[in-house]
């Protein structure tokens, strides 16, 4: 690819390559969860131990995310994505070549350390190539990488694992190898001023004197728990709790992740339209909490709605990531966005690493409904933390226009005679005629 892609088609081509490379890293990070049925059946591995093994890539991510972000700010996206994908592939091949679960866990941990740079680099790459009015949509498409990576793992790994754990691990190894080659051939860093030409204000830390980024980090970390829990345990829940076959459960998980991918594109476009990344995040958090509480209420009751609710939360739980990543790159700027995304992904991965073993133990000792109810507390706690007043640079006018529309609608539906009272029955905005004495009468029909 040309080293100076200025056309619209070239920008979208870079975004597609970035999507594929990031999807390969998420395939490795989340794919181990689809080995759990094989580990339980063939090796008798307890669910808590299998959950710990599935979390090892996330623990590796936690260790290196900030370091990858620092490197990203200094060497650029292409180098980080190529090197990270190659090292992840090497770790996956190593994990597939050993028999001991201990050594498999070690290599999964090392692979997680290597995979840490792809997500941050891919997000910053897309943010750098697209203008504000297209950034939410472009980032939403790029953020389909996670559900697409998980969907491919759910479709392929359980079937390969029927031949053994090692066969299942070879799939992410091959895909990450292809991603490393694609990074070298298809990624071009967006044009930026060198750090030596940047002003002191541009190089200043966005964390100084502001809690905006910390609030986004905290909210996104809390919203990561439903995503982690559903990805890790949906397959085994369908197999053990509902008696589904491995193939049937894998197909449903795949469909759920594909719906989540489409949802990410939709909410990205939504954020461009309303001129805000954070208002949709707050609504997503509230919807995730409500869905998990409903799932906890109907699970074990023999209801036919529990599977539908599981699909719903699997979709809702993945919707917010692209919005948060976009807001961070816009707020932090080109010289701090790598480190800010590194911190963001570190907080998310701490939750992702802690979730499988903790909830695996809870499911074993209590039951699935208890786990769903506790999981619902996390997105509920995120609701007040979301900084909804944060406006994307370049979209402030659009956001204010939306606010004016909402204000006018509210003025229309309020009671004109008593502004602080409830709205009178009837169509919104219906005026009330007032007699000379001040008594309101019903308008003619």
Curated annotation (Swiss-Prot):
Classification via SUPFAM superfamilies: MFS general substrate transporter (SSF103473)
Chief location bin: membrane
GO molecular function: transmembrane transporter activity
Superkingdom as given in the UniProt entry: Bacteria
S-adenosyl-L-methionine recorded as keyword: no
Membrane topology (UniProt): Multi-pass membrane protein
InterPro entries hit by this protein: MFS (IPR011701), MFS-Transporter (IPR052952), MFS_dom (IPR020846), MFS_trans_sf (IPR036259)
Pfam family, one: MFS_1
Subcellular localization: Cell membrane
Region (Disordered): 417-445
A GO cellular component entry from the record: plasma membrane
Chain segments annotated as transmembrane: 16-36, 52-72, 98-118, 168-188, 219-239, 243-263, 283-303, 366-386
This protein's UniProt keywords: Cell membrane, Membrane, Transmembrane, Transmembrane helix, Transport
Family of the protein in this entry: Belongs to the major facilitator superfamily.
Protein name: Uncharacterized MFS-type transporter Rv2994
Source organism of the structure: Mycobacterium tuberculosis (strain ATCC 25618 / H37Rv)
Lineage start: Bacteria, Bacillati, Actinomycetota, Actinomycetes, Mycobacteriales
